[in-house]
Amino acid sequence: MSAITITQAAEDYLAELLSKQDTPGIGIRVFITQPGTPYAETCIAYCKPGEQKPEDTPVGLASFTAWIDAVSEPFLEDAVVDYATDRMGGQLTIKAPNAKVPMVNEDSPLNERINYYLQTEINPGLASHGGQVSLVDVVEEGIAVLRFGGGCQGCGQADYTLKEGIEKTLLERIPELKGVRDVTDHSNRENAYY
């Protein structure tokens, strides 16, 4: 069984849409464009018989088949497709909490592991101040070169955040990393949090 949940309300709604397509055996295909990146988008498309890919995972529902894209499937873990009625009729929603989370392991390249921890552990905390940090480069000495943005750019606490928060977390998670360096122009204090 797939990691995605399609509620009964969503299944009923989609079955009604599919019945209007006048194509016997038509189903849906669920996929994510740019999975594991900040630009990931979860999509549902009509899937006529034969349009599915051989590596897709079929999920047999009562009145149609949902084909899950093989590349997207790990990013669809805990995803829920639902349909909620409202005064305007209703709305199909797709919640895929892992769509933008990169899939990394200890064998992944260093820059991918750094980006993973920046996105999953560091940036959620910085977001409360309207800020974020991104990886610019990893230099030969094993130093991650980072750039602050948003409320962190020009913030008086950026040095403390860099050394006591970001560097400690990254060194703990990635032993071969030797340190971090900030290349942000902090003279621009327009959006600074502190």
Curated annotation (Swiss-Prot):
Domain of life, per lineage: Bacteria
GO BP terms: iron-sulfur cluster assembly; protein maturation
Disulfide-bonded cysteines: none
UniProt keyword annotations, A-Z: 4Fe-4S, Iron, Iron-sulfur, Metal-binding
Residues the record lists as binding [4Fe-4S] cluster: 152, 155
Cofactor field: [4Fe-4S] cluster
Keyword Transmembrane helix: no
PANTHER family to which the protein is assigned, alphabetical: FE_S BIOGENESIS PROTEIN NFUA (PTHR11178:SF51), IRON-SULFUR CLUSTER SCAFFOLD PROTEIN NFU-RELATED (PTHR11178)
Subunit structure: Homodimer.
Family designation: Belongs to the NfuA family.
Protein name: Fe/S biogenesis protein NfuA
Species annotation: Ectopseudomonas mendocina (strain ymp) (Pseudomonas mendocina)
